[in-house]
């Protein structure tokens, strides 16, 4: 199974552990990420038009070459290709078009057998100083709700399935030990990107379950310097809610 993410640092977060997670469960996934930090749908569309080799072609969050989107689409026989809006605009549906239509048509023309998926990303951490947080009144719940509404709208419009990472992260934020508002650990490393341990692990498990349908308990891989109680809590939540 070959998966290409057309994204930014948030798809980098989500795919960092996905190959290791899936391989440890005996169902290895081939995963690549097209990375430009802070890349919006508008920028992706412009880069397609220019055929600019502006992207890091990443394996496990490490760039191995520079590439354009048209080149990447032809590089493998992709089974799935994911798209997403940049985080600050992810809950602003008016920012998706006309770029979403152009990107989807480009993918369908180049990879007619691939299923296009929409990656629902997460809201910023409570108290985040991100410059786009005021657009959501600095409210995590308002931002999360806006992301859900926008992604639902475009998933319905283009008949896309959603990878619900944003839902899973929000759910974990209301469970111990990740209830940050009550003194628990944050799932973010800088109040918006996912933490390098539990946040990225949770996202990888979400993608793993989406693509394989397998139990998270089949996964034996865990990131370094993590506590069993925490990784096990994420696995249990994944099986219960995803």
Predicted regions and their residues:
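Alpha-helical cap/lid subdomain in secreted, periplasmic
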Residues: 67-196, 209, 218
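A structural signal for well-ordered alpha-helical scaffolds and beta->alpha junctions
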Residues: 11, 15, 100, 144-148, ...
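Conserved SGNH/GDSL esterase-like catalytic core that processes O-acyl groups on lipids
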Residues: 2-4, 10-97
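Conserved catalytic region of serine esterases and O-acyltransferases that act on ester linkages
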Residues: 184-187, 191-242
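Alpha-helix termini
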Residues: 20-21, 172, 216, 226
């Amino acid at each position: 199974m070959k998966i290409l993410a057309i994204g930014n640092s948030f798809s980098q977060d989500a795919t960092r552990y996905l190959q290791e997670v899936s391989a440890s469960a005996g169902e290895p996934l081939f995963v690549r990420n097209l990375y430009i930090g802070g890349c919006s749908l508008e920028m992706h569309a412009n880069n397609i038009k220019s055929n600019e080799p502006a992207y890091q072609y990443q394996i496990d969050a490490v760039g191995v070459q520079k590439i354009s989107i048209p080149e990447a689409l032809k590089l493998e026989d992709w089974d799935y290709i994911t798209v997403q809006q940049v985080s600050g605009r992810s809950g602003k549906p008016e920012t998706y078009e006309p770029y979403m239509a152009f990107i989807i048509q480009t993918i369908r023309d180049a990879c007619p057998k691939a299923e296009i998926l929409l990656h629902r990303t997460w809201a910023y951490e409570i108290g985040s100083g991100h410059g786009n947080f005021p657009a959501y009144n600095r409210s995590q719940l308002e931002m999360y709700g806006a992301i859900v509404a926008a992604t639902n709208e475009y998933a319905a419009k283009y008949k896309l399935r959603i990878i619900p990472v944003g839902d899973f992260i929000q759910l974990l934020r209301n469970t111990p030990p990740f209830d940050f508002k009550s003194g628990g650990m944050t799932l973010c490393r800088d109040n918006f990107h996912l933490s390098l341990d539990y946040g990225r692990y949770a996202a990888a498990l979400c993608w793993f379950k989406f693509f394989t349908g397998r139990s998270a308990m089949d996964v034996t891989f865990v990131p370094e310097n993590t506590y069993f109680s925490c990784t096990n809590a994420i696995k249990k939540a994944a099986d219960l809610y995803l």
